[in-house]
Regions:
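Short hydrophobic beta-strand element within catalytic cores of glycosyltransferases
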Residues: 317-320
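Carbohydrate-associated surface elements
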Residues: 184, 203
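N-terminal strand-loop element at the rim of the active site
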Residues: 11, 19, 28-35, 47-105
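Glycosyltransferase donor-sugar binding loop
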Residues: 62, 222, 247-261, 277
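A conserved mid-protein helix/loop that constitutes part of the nucleotide-sugar donor-binding site
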Residues: 40, 44, 217, 224-240, ...
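Nucleotide-activated donor-binding/catalytic signature segment of Leloir-type glycosyltransferases, i.e.
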Residues: 261-282
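Conserved acidic donor-binding segment of nucleotide-sugar-dependent glycosyltransferases
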Residues: 332, 336-344, 352-358
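A short, well-ordered alpha-helix in the C-terminal region of glycosyltransferases
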Residues: 352, 359-374, 383-385
Length: 401
């Protein structure tokens, strides 16, 4: 029988030590309508804080269904109504940045909505993600009148920050507490804005149980179709992987039309490839829990690798590119690293691991333990609550002085 690795009971399920009711505004510069790592982080951050008794509102873009959205955003997304604790502040546009194509809110109307919101709502603290991103995060730094926490996610050169560096630096002086999700994100931020950054990693939801063995004959890719995600490398490797293993490839998160064009360009026409596009959180967890392994063939500029820890939480082994952001998360006990962009190495690693169920089970169980010990959102939420508590205590002491 497959061994089931069960998540332990959280060490504390009580409320935060913050005595007075606290309301936190979580500011995200992207669109709620399009899946991405920062959006996912903010969503689970809000849930983790609410479990501790901290009220949250997520301030983020939203692209409702209609012709304008279809014209501005060719890729698939979710266009239903955001939940009640989400405050939509405007539409987004696609902006090439850091070898990716994020959907960033840039409209002037969003800036004025932020100003009105921060003047009228009673936030005790603002937590800004990617604080140097126009326009919502910059506007929040300008108009917030409460303690500010900022989390830096991106890794890479971030060379655009050289333009107006003194302006950005002046804005960052308004931040009371700087967080980076990884050492790579910290180094990238420190290059332009030296200072103290505490590393608080991306968290992951831990399923109650996970079978480390007995998986379906599927290989999983999760991510957008951005060039840096390495989907083209995996597609070039796939015909030989399929010939050796007989598995199916399931692609999640990437727009089906874009994947189809990429397959045509790489001359990969294989009936063993399923392109699922955007799926719900529940569907995504089911896919990861049942896959033989997850492949993360990114070419670079990854600060962390949330798809890796999601796989760990589901006891799913990983084959990933040997890039700094991934190598800091993946160990020899939880997966396999291969040179980025090396099709032959990817074929060999995936084929060998697919054929070795005992090794897959061992890697999956070790990854599950690592996720529970280091990346549980219950623990990350408590760390954030402690940071907030310290800042709010300082603010109260300053007001009383």
């Amino acid at each position: 029988m497959p061994h089931r690795v069960t998540a332990p009971t959280p060490r504390s399920t009580g409320r935060s030590h913050i005595l007075a009711p606290v309301k936190v505004g979580i500011v995200v510069p992207f669109s709620w309508s399009y899946w991405g790592g920062v959006n996912e982080h903010a969503f689970h951050q809000a849930r983790a804080l609410e479990k501790l008794g901290i009220e949250t509102r997520t301030i983020i873009g939203h692209d409702p269904p209609g012709l304008q959205t279809r014209l501005l955003h060719p890729r698939a997304g979710r266009h239903d109504r955001p939940p009640a604790d989400v405050i939509p502040i405007g539409r987004s546009v696609i902006v090439p940045a850091n070898a990716s194509l994020p959907n960033i809110v840039l409209s002037p109307s969003a800036i004025f909505r932020i100003r009105k919101l921060l003047r009228e709502d009673t936030f005790d603290l603002i937590h800004v993600h990617e604080p140097m991103t126009p326009a919502t995060c910059v506007a929040s730094l300008v108009w917030a009148r409460c303690p500010i926490v900022a989390t830096h996610h991106a890794a890479g050169d971030l060379g655009w920050l050289r333009y107006g560096q003194h302006f950005w630096g002046h804005l960052l002086q308004r931040v009371d507490y700087r967080i980076a999700v990884s050492e790579q994100a910290k180094l990238s931020a420190e290059r332009w804005f030296p200072g103290h950054y505490e590393i608080v990693p991306n968290g992951v939801q831990i399923p109650e149980t996970a079978d480390a063995g007995g998986r379906a004959a599927t290989i999983l890719f999760i991510g957008r179709h951005d060039a840096r995600k390495g989907l083209e490398v995996l597609l070039r490797a796939w015909p030989e992987i399929h010939r050796r293993t007989g598995t199916r490839l399931r692609i999640i998160g990437a727009d089906p039309l874009a994947v189809g064009l990429l397959m045509a360009r790489t001359h990969v026409h294989d009936a063993s490839i399923d392109v699922l596009g955007f799926v719900s959180e529940e569907e995504l967890t089911r896919e990861v829990e049942t896959a033989q392994l997850l492949v993360a063939p990114s070419l670079g500029q990854e600060s962390f690798g949330m798809v890796l820890t999601r796989a760990f939480a589901c006891a799913t082994p990983v084959v990933a590119s040997d890039i700094p952001g991934y190598a800091a998360v993946l160990t020899a006990e939880t997966g396999v690293l291969v040179p980025p962009g090396d099709v032959a190495a990817l074929v060999d690693a995936v084929s060998a691991l697919s054929a070795d169920e005992p090794r897959r089970r061992a890697l999956g169980e070790a990854g599950r333990r690592l996720a529970i010990e280091r990346y549980s959102w219950d623990d990350i939420g408590r760390r954030l609550a402690a940071i907030y508590e310290g800042l709010l205590a300082q603010a109260r002491a300053g007001s009383a002085a």
